[in-house]
């Protein structure tokens, strides 16, 4: 089994290598930061399924007791029809590793990957994905329309 907890920008390549090596995979979310990465992950996930390799993504809320209970209540029609919803992610910054004089730009970005879109995606991709996943899970389908706003690079 391979556990992928590297920065998301590298995950599609690591996932591809693990699947080609015949390994089962747990990988953190997000699984990629761009469309080519997503395409690679989808392709390799199909191969993994054909080869009966297990792949699990770290969408943690699906394993939290209170979320499981709410999902069960929704499935058992205890809350009525859900006709719309909103999900939010509000957060301040996370860790920052100050630049050291001897560091290259690449090393600095690697150590602070959360702040570089090519490595992280952005805070919506990196963190808000949990709330988007919960909305899809509770509704039981994917949205036909969505809207988002925010920013970190302002």
Place the predicted regions along the sequence by residue:
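Beta-strand-loop-alpha-helix segment that lines the small-molecule cofactor/substrate pocket
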Residues: 7-8, 12-63, 77
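Predominantly a Rossmann-like dinucleotide-binding segment in NAD(P)-dependent oxidoreductases
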Residues: 51-154
